[in-house]
Regions:
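Iron-associated oxidoreductase/ferritin-like identity signal
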Residues: 1-121
Length: 121
């Protein structure tokens, strides 16, 4: 099962990088300065990063699910705040939100499959 999940998690990571690029570009358009120092990301992030401590695929999936759910809440907040006020940022937030919901669904599906496999063993 790990061989099926790893490419999907890599795809998620690529999409997260794309999200960061979209947000950095928008910050620049608004004449702000994106955070480029990873240490600052940890300080300012609404969702905290937790480095994996267990290599078991179930643990990794659960940890990723927590992160995706936090991201969903944050992008929903941004979409709500910018609705009717900043159409460009609102559009970016809702596009990212859709991706995050898709990631959440992928992770839930994998966790469900993993649970079914365990029950059959």
């Amino acid at each position: 099962m790990r061989s099926e999940i790893e490419p999907e998690l890599l795809k998620h990571a690529e999409e997260e990088l794309y999200h960061a690029e979209l947000l950095a570009e928008r910050i620049l358009q608004l004449e702000g300065t994106p955070l480029i120092d990873p240490q600052e990301w940890f300080t300012h992030a609404g969702c905290k990063y937790a480095a994996p401590t267990d290599i078991y695929i179930g643990s990794i999936l659960n940890q990723n699910l927590i992160g995706e759910r936090c991201a969903i809440n944050r992008y929903q907040e941004i979409a709500n705040i910018t609705s009717g006020i900043d159409h460009t940022t609102h559009k970016i937030a809702t596009e990212i939100l859709e991706d995050e919901i898709e990631h959440e669904n992928d992770l839930v599906d994998y966790l469900t499959d993993l649970k079914l496999i365990k029950e059959k063993i």
